[in-house]
Amino acid sequence: MTHLSDLDIANQSTLQPIKDIAASVGISEDALEPYGHYKAKIDINKITPRENKGKVVLVTAMSPTPAGEGKSTVTVGLADAFHELNKNVMVALREPALGPTFGIKGGATGGGYAQVLPMEDINLHFNGDFHAITTANNALSAFIDNHIHQGNELGIDQRRIEWKRVLDMNDRALRHVNVGLGGPTNGVPREDGFNITVASEIMAILCLSRSIKDLKDKISRITIGYTRDRKPVTVADLKVEGALAMILKDAIKPNLVQSIEGTPALVHGGPFANIAHGCNSILATETARDLADIVVTEAGFGSDLGAEKFMDIKVREAGFDPAAVVVVATIRALKMHGGVAKDNLKEENVEAVKAGIVNLERHVNNIKKFGVEPVVAINAFIHDTDAEVEYVKSWAKENNVRIALTEVWKKGGKGGVDLANEVLEVIDQPNSFKPLYELELPLEQKIEKIVTEIYGGSKVTFSSKAQKQLKQFKENGWDNYPVCMAKTQYSFSDDQTLLGAPSGFEITIRELEAKTGAGFIVALTGAIMTMPGLPKKPAALNMDVTDDGHAIGLF
């Protein structure tokens, strides 16, 4: 049986005018800033806050296969299912990054009949937010180098500049570069490098800001480097926070689009969860809470990455509690964690599902540690067998875990009604949400708590560089920040080949980064890179554009 591609399904769908989508949740036309017929930005100053804000449902996942487990698909499909049940609902997602779109993932707007549209536009530039973030980031780099060239009044040590340039592309050749070459008229030579845009602190700040004033305040606190006597230098010292915030004045506004079934969707911000905090913007989530009774959102990768950061970073900053958490599981991921090779994942193997269930079990238990009841969504794939699915259901029943088979890829909202009903039962009950750790704990203890309680590790080892940074960060008064772990998404450990639910392992923190603007400390583990590279056969090889300007190959 031939299945339509995601792009074919998207192209066959009929979109409603964006003003009609806006009106369906009470957004007035004067609050709408259209970008064509089917996209718009929202002027948040013209949205009336309401007292009884909508409840937030977070969608996370078990540790994924390289292809991903359809978390965005389930997120959109669940929102469509609530829509099917006549609930007042919105979905809030991150924006896709171009680098991974051309790399391994292809597009990132959901899949099958659970997508947000217009799919081509969202995957390719969208409303220009990533361009603005890239520009603001690189403008700061230009201001830093110009300050040094013009006499260096602040005494910045060019050997200790922490701020890097960014690009929205996977480009390993740019990880380490030299700038300022070519003689005295071209600046002061120094080592530099590029990160991918989604790893930029500007991206994190945009997603954690509640207003333009908050955005400007956070930008002013960015630590760009140090003086020769190791004193931090901030954007406020350079006096360019106003200029940088000005570049972002439109990017900070949430973007309104729609699902295939007409569910309103806010798609805004896009930090990765393995190298950043992995959540869409607070402004988009809070705007949705002012407009809808239920807000379905997602956090990148598994509970060990995006969900933990959602609970310990985003929720702290935003000030709301999640009402329910959905953990997406797939039969293929369970088999992978049960020892099946990638090429054999389509073959029935109930024993491998049994062996791999330990991975899902740890993710479920992780959510419980935050005081929220999880609901498992089995995201159905065409090669799943009844025996494999029934085993997962029986495991859930034995362990008193809520579960639903979800067929939103194939059926849209109708395929997610069982999941929606399970979630409705949870959000109607009180929970006892609490973050994993108190901010007053020393940084190393916060890291140890994440490693031992969420990852299942036994010990944290700090490199000599990380130990020196811990000491320096404490002296600078940065000990009370939350921690943002940078770690592989494929394993609970820092070794991506260690699958299932390993325990007793050690995690090495090789380096720390102070994101004093965003307000967290990044702890880098293993070989994690903040500028990815492209695979041997990038998804770009299957992409093209027709003579009349339509994309081909965006999945």
From Swiss-Prot:
For this protein, the record's SUPFAM superfamilies field holds: P-loop containing nucleoside triphosphate hydrolases
- EC annotation? 6.3.4.3
Under catalytic activity, the entry for this protein gives: (6S)-5,6,7,8-tetrahydrofolate + formate + ATP = (6R)-10-formyltetrahydrofolate + ADP + phosphate
Domain of life, per UniProt, equals Bacteria
Per UniProt, the keywords (alphabetical) are: ATP-binding, Ligase, Nucleotide-binding, One-carbon metabolism
Pfam families of this UniProt entry?
FTHFS
Protein's UniProt name: Formate--tetrahydrofolate ligase
The organism that produces this protein has a lineage beginning with:
Bacteria, Bacillati, Bacillota, Bacilli, Bacillales
The gene coding this protein: fhs
